[in-house]
């Protein structure tokens, strides 16, 4: 069995006291900003989806606010005239800690402090969370198109109360609060990656079952498709018995869990994060050894 169901399809919804009487949806349901024209919109979250949705909705809404429960670092889409991923590729020869140090320094110089924009200070080191890449959010905040808000405390009708003792009315709330690592076709007693580690060798080979494989069960700092392509190539070699499962695959899985590419916070998304360049190198190395 080859599992390719992805990890961005089962929405995770936040839970707050009270009941919101307006429209409440997840970013998974968001298609375009047009339906929110002339409405008061509150976006929850600080990741890429949240910031993109906030920017897009602010173009048509009567009001857009963005609620963060913690601080995030915003990375511009372009650094020194180059797309950020191109810039990151040029630094791929560096150790990950040094890359994070350099990228964080450049981002801080480019953006300044979050405090300038009314945003909370990041509570993690650069690289401890997935980067939020957006070149319009801070511009929109400084021009009054997006209003930063702290964490939500509770709902009462269309009124939203925040933890700084302020409250405002909204017509629409869009929760950009991530997704679960869900495999509903498996009994949870057999396999459950919703919580806890994901012990898969190269994020694809199960340590116990040699006929169960996963493609795309990783979160790269970059595009997922090249990595999924290399996994597919390695899978084809495994199915043809050209690539042999390591005899110590269980210990290799344990090592991947205990020694991740990057030390990040313990959430579903970050438990499957890989360093794009290192991950590609590891997969290509296994393919080369087999052929």
Language model regions located:
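Short low-complexity, flexible loop/linker segments enriched in glycine and/or proline
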Residues: 80-82
